[in-house]
Amino acid sequence: MAGARGAARFRPGAGGPALGLPLSELRDQRVDLADLHPALARLLPGTLDLKTAAGRVLDVAGRLTADGPADNAVAHVSRMLGDPRARAEDVAGEVGISTRQLRRRCHDTVGYGPKTLQRVLRFRRFVSRIDAGDVDLAAIAADVGYSDQAHLTRECAEMAGLTPAVLARLRGAG
């Protein structure tokens, strides 16, 4: 498995505490596990058969999530930002922190600010709908919080580098 690559996805608020550093430092980068967590990297030596590698990856994932608790405030914030009408100022007030603190905590635990988190969550809702076989792009756009289908198209191009129709086709919908 020399040169093999993998990725980790954390639920909002869990990545920073699990890795022990602000995720904003890792955004848009490929980082070697040995640079982040040498002890865990040693669990994944160079050449493994696929079954052993999969077991070790699951072990590493379990250790990463066990290393530190998620920022529960950010987890709550991500649920609130799932509402496309939510505003950062209102969410911060609901959680009992300033808007500036909200931005900092989001950057540290998620890797980007609340507005970008809201965009990502909206895009994930769109992808979930097309994965479920929904092909009415205009209806999906309205349902998940885009102002119109053109807004969905711009955001899809930015997030995935594809039009919504092409993304749906590649994911098996439509």
Residue ranges and their predicted role:
Residues 76-77, 126, 152-155:
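Short, hydrophobic/aromatic alpha-helical segments in well-folded domains
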